[in-house]
């Protein structure tokens, strides 16, 4: 295993981190995951890739993503989502429902990543990707009108 691979294998215990710290990590993991997915499926100009990635990573898109996966979550995962939704970081934007849901999703992603539950994380993110494909078609259709 390379040093780079070892870098992501961590002895950090997610349960000992604040929920906002989990969201901080989750934001990076989620964004990187969909940036790479976008590169694989949209081998076009960077501007197009950026706009496509925004469908996934903006707060509104993350709220939709959370709605897609909520019914598949375990009780443990639901607790993390609930904590993320109610976190101090989520409340910074006042009553912005999109931002609260985005923070909740990021907390879950960060938690699963730091727990090393990569298969579970991929399973959930693939559900998001499959659902967002329909948003992408709508966005492309709307941009042509």
Swiss-Prot record:
The active site is at residue 27. Its EC number is 3.1.26.-. GO terms for biological process: rRNA processing. Its cofactor is Mg(2+). Keywords: Cytoplasm, Endonuclease, Hydrolase, Magnesium, Nuclease, Ribosome biogenesis, RNA-binding, rRNA processing, rRNA-binding. It is an enzyme of class 3 (hydrolase). One of its GO terms (cellular component) is cytoplasm. One of its GO terms (molecular function) is ribonuclease III activity. It is found in: Cytoplasm. SUPFAM superfamilies: RNase III domain-like. The keyword Nuclease applies. Involved in correct processing of both the 5' and 3' ends of 23S rRNA precursor. Processes 30S rRNA precursor transcript even in absence of ribonuclease 3 (Rnc); Rnc processes 30S rRNA into smaller rRNA precursors. Belongs to the MrnC RNase family. Homodimer. This is Mini-ribonuclease 3. The lineage of its organism: Bacteria, Thermotogati, Thermotogota, Thermotogae, Kosmotogales. The gene is mrnC.
């Amino acid at each position: 295993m390379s040093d780079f691979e070892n870098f992501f294998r961590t002895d950090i215990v997610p349960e000992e981190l604040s929920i906002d710290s989990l969201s901080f990590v989750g934001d990076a993991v989620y964004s990187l995951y969909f940036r790479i997915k976008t590169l694989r499926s949209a081998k076009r100009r960077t501007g197009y890739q950026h706009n496509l990635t925004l469908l996934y990573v903006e707060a509104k898109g993350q709220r939709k993503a959370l709605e897609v996966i909520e019914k598949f979550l375990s009780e443990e995962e639901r607790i993390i989502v609930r904590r993320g939704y109610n976190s101090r970081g989520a409340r910074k934007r006042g009553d912005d429902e999109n931002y609260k849901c985005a923070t909740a999703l990021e907390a879950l992603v960060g938690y699963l990543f730091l727990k090393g539950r990569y298969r579970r994380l991929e399973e959930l993110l693939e559900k998001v990707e499959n659902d967002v494909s329909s948003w992408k078609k709508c966005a492309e259709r709307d941009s042509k009108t």
